[in-house]
């Protein structure tokens, strides 16, 4: 779990920005969004192959 220590006199906005960067780096928000709804294995497989095809076409 990411944490940020706020020093005396440090703006809260700066601490929030640092916290958001840490959360993005660890992928916590992305994982939470992916676990929000259940995806059937066939749907996951189809999305994965579609993403791979899109990547190959570049």
From Swiss-Prot:
One of its GO terms (biological process) is translation. One of its GO terms (cellular component) is ribonucleoprotein complex. Gene3D superfamilies: Ribosomal protein S8 (1.20.5.1150). InterPro entries: Ribosomal_bS21 (IPR001911), Ribosomal_bS21_sf (IPR038380). GO terms for molecular function: structural constituent of ribosome. Residues 39-58 are annotated as: Disordered. Keywords: Ribonucleoprotein, Ribosomal protein. Residues 43-58 have a biased composition (Basic residues). It comes from the Bacteria. HAMAP family: Ribosomal_bS21. Belongs to the bacterial ribosomal protein bS21 family. This is Small ribosomal subunit protein bS21. It comes from Chlamydia pneumoniae. The gene is rpsU.
């Amino acid at each position: 779990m990411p944490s940020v220590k706020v020093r005396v006199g440090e703006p809260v906005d700066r601490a929030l920005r640092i916290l958001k960067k840490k959360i993005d780096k660890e992928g916590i928000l992305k994982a939470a969004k992916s676990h929000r709804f259940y995806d059937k294995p066939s749907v996951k497989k189809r999305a994965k192959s579609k993403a791979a095809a899109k990547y190959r076409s570049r």
